[in-house]
Each structure stands twice: as C-alpha cells, then as structure tokens.
Amino acid sequence: MTTTIPHPPLLPKTPWLRPLFEAIISGERLSEEHALQLLLLKDDEDLQALWSLADQVRKQRVGDVVYYSSTLYLYPTNFCTYNCTFCSFYAKPGDPKGWYYTPEQLLEQIAQVHNPITEVHIVAGCTPSCDLHYYTKLFSLIKHAYPDVHIKALTAIEYAYLESLHNIPVKEILTILKEAGLDSIPGGGAEILVDKVRDLLAPGRISSARYLEIHKTAHELGIPTNSIMLCYHRETPEDIVTHLKLLRELQDETRGFKNFVILKFANINNALGRRLKKLGVPHAIPPRSLMAVSRLFLDNFLNLKAMWNYLGIEEALHMLSCGANDLSSTHQGEKVFEMASLGYPVKLDIEGMANLIQKQGRIPCLTNSKNV
C-alpha cells in the first residue's frame, strides 16, 4: 500500500525512529527488520508515538468506523483426538466435562436466543462423530431456518481432520460445505506460524505451511477467512514477525483475509499454562504494541480486531487507538475463553457495544464476517 498519510501528532524521542516513521507516513512498506525493532521499543515516549502512528494509519486506511457483530457461538462437541498443551476446551471420551450436540439440538440453541444475531461461530473438537455429513446437515438446517445469518465455521485444524477422516481433499470438503451454507472460516489453528513453536503447543497438528494452504484454498473458492495470532506463550519477537510476514505474503496473493485478531494465551486450566508459571513468557511486548505493529506491517489488511472479552473492555478500547477498527462481538454462548478462565464478568449487548464505541468518538457499525 502506498497511501500517504498525515504526520502523527506524536513524534518518537529516539532520533533514529523519526526517519522510519516518516518512511511509513510516505507509504513505504514496513520491513521485517524494522517491525522487530518497533516491537522491542521500551521508552514510554517512543511507545506512545508508535501507538499514535498506528492510529493515524488506521484512520487513513479505514476511517473512524468501528465494526461489531451480534454473534452466537455454537460448539457441537469438545471431545477431541488431539492433546494440545494450550487448550482448556477439549475433553477425552468418558470425561464428564465433555458434551456432544446433534445438529437439531444446535438449531434449538439458536431458537432460544432472545437477542437478534448476525452470525453464528461454530468450532468443535476433532472427533469422528462430527464428520462431513454432520456439518453438511448442520449448515443446511441453519441456512434453511435462518437464511440471513452468516455461518463462520470450523478452523483449518478441523478441515484437515475431515480430510484425513474421509480421505477427501480439503478443496472438495470446502466446496460441499459452501454449498450447504458455509460463509466464512475463523482463524483458529494459526497460533504462531513457526513450526518449532507449534510443535511445543500442539504436537501432531498441521504445519504452518498446511494452515496457510487451507486458507489459500478457501480464498480460491471465494470463502473469506479470518487470521489470528496467539501470543504470550513460547513465541519470541522474531517469531511474531515471521507470523505477520507469512500472513502478509498470502494476503498479497489472495486478498482473502477479512480480519486479523491478536489473542492472548490463557495460562489457566491447561498443561502449557502450568509449565509457563515456572518458565515465564519469553518477551514482555505490550499488547498495544502488538496491535500497532500489526497495523503498520499488515498494510494489506483492512480490519484488525480487539477482542474485548479476551482483553477486558478497557484494554480493548485502548486498542482502538492503536490500530484496531473492530471491537469483536457480543460473544453469546462463548465457552473457549470461559473454560480457560479468561471470561470477563461484564456482558455486552449490541446497544452496549455501540455506546462504548461512540464514547470513543468513533462510529459504530453492526455487521458480520461477510463484510469484515
């Protein structure tokens, strides 16, 4: 992107940063080396200037609109064949905390929601009981009953699992599910796109390259996807830059990513969290700097999301001044964060979200993942 933007209101204290900021202002693409340098900034004045710059870039690229959605989360099952060390969600067969819902039961969950919803977000464990036939039926039932509700469903991990379960290429699986009603794909399963880190988090799951291949296939079929980055576990600042680079490269090729989300690892109720209490986290990059550098580096992404239920409302609102332009959703029925003890006691409906956005001097826009 080569858009010229006005000078930010704050200038960095460190002299060598000023020409870098000016280069960004003039539309020069941020390099991996410079992205790493920005992530490692520690001086308060430099940090404030970085966040301010990202806010100005956001304003130039996408204006003052802040998106939000009314989302119902559906979880067909949490039984899973994988043993991901960072996961607080999964259960093994026979575990009393496990569950399984039929497509009809999930349709009833939608019917019981009192607030209007714009989309359903569907993810589950990887288990033979939730196969291609199951999801084809589920999506078809939802679209028949609620044709205007956007279906955002299944991560790259689940599509790879369905491929191995049925011995059918992912492209064919995506085609079948798109015909059944699939509208977009969430970004889960990315974590950090560096295989040595992925092997620590989830041994035996798909590689970074395979994750990107599945998203590329979806893009080629006209299915937009989200992308995520999970931070504060075993990743280094260099790994963060590698992750952003790989996403930017695929976006240059396909333009199929609709949104980028930074997630904070929850170190409660999982094996990795217990380890990290002894080992510590390998960096102390402020979340606002992660958002700011992501906005500057991902110059081909329009929408960056601040997950208020992950960050807390106050921090999420700060993110809106560091490059974010999406406050996520109402998160009705959300369980993954809740089971990781990350759930915040505050509940937001669509009116509450709109009011918060307006108080920041921004323009609220209710939407779904079809548009952002």
Regions found by a protein language model. Name each.
Residues M1-D43, E108, K245-V372:
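Auxiliary Fe-S-binding modules of radical SAM enzymes
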Residues G27, A54, C84, I122, ...:
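Conserved, mostly hydrophobic/aromatic
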Residues L38-L41, T71-L74, A124-P128, C231-R234, ...:
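Conserved short loop/turn motifs at secondary-structure junctions
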Residues A49-P93, G98-V123:
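N-terminal pre-triad scaffold of radical SAM enzymes
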Residues R61, A145-V149, L221, T254, ...:
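Helix C-cap/helix->beta junction micro-motif
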Residues V66, C87, F139-K143, P147-L162, ...:
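Mobile, glycine- and charge-enriched loop segments
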